[in-house]
């Protein structure tokens, strides 16, 4: 969600600092955004928590939901996004590297 919100801010011409200041002082505030925003701004995707590990954890959570016969709509959507980032070569990078894939998907043909 953070990545999609930041990509939308980019598309609207809102700079990253303004986005960060608004979101972190509102109901959108969250620890992941606070912890990863500097890495995103610097495009520093050295792994703190590798994207491959996010995929593994999401797959385990999905399997648990399936075994319990519980719906997992948002989990599956997130898993698809992280798998796409894996296929784009981001697996060994920090999980925040998913923002680059989202940004690339949102680029308009010039």
Question: Which residues does each PLM region occupy?
Answer:
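Helical "substrate-binding/catalytic lid" subdomain
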Residues: 1-105
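ATP-dependent carboxylate/acyl-activation modules
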Residues: 109-110
